[in-house]
């Protein structure tokens, strides 16, 4: 993956990102992009797997690429957690028809459309970290 001229490839160093994507290729692509920018990525394939990870580790950012309905129920469950359990973790929804207003109304901080721009993803994760 080439270096993006305006974005340092280690700018996400130490950021813990939990990825929830039911598609193996999507999960791997997200892992590669975020790892390239320095993030520590835990990819999961399901809501149940992600919930199990969140009971053990509190991610800095949550990225959700699930079919509509599954993602809504999952983020609702996350938002019902206490802050110390991860209930306030910044979250990004990824979908073909992503809409920021709709995503925010569901409990996400932002959304990204597919196909993804790798640098846009890394910049968005970085911006969510500076807001915290």
Where are these regions (language model features)?
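Non-catalytic signal-transmission and effector/linker regions of two-component phosphorelay proteins
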Residues: 1-24, 31, 37, 48, ...
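Short beta-strand/turn micro-motifs composed of small residues
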Residues: 19-21, 64, 93-95
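Short acidic, S/G/P-rich loop/turn micro-motifs used as interaction or catalytic elements
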Residues: 23-26, 65-71, 98-100, 118
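Short beta-strand element of Class I
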Residues: 41
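Acidic, metal-coordinating helix/loop segments flanking the phosphotransfer/catalytic sites
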Residues: 45-61, 68-69
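Conserved phosphotransfer cores of two-component systems
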Residues: 55-57, 77-88, 106
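Conserved phosphotransfer microenvironments
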Residues: 63-82
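Alpha4 helix (beta4-alpha4-beta5 surface) of REC/receiver domains from two-component response regulators
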Residues: 73, 93-114, 123
């Amino acid at each position: 993956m080439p270096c993006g001229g305006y974005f340092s490839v280690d700018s996400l160093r130490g950021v813990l990102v939990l990825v929830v994507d039911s598609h193996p290729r999507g999960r791997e692509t997200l892992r590669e992009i975020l790892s390239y920018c320095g993030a520590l990525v835990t990819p999961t394939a399901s809501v149940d797997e992600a919930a199990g990870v969140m009971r053990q580790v509190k991610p800095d950012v949550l990225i959700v690429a699930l079919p509509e309905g599954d993602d809504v129920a999952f983020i609702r469950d996350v938002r019902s957690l206490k802050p110390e359990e991860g209930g306030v973790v910044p979250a990004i929804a990824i979908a073909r028809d992503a809409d920021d207003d709709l995503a925010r109304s569901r409990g996400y901080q932002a959304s990204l459309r597919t196909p993804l721009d790798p640098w846009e993803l890394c910049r968005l994760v970085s911006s969510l970290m500076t807001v915290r």
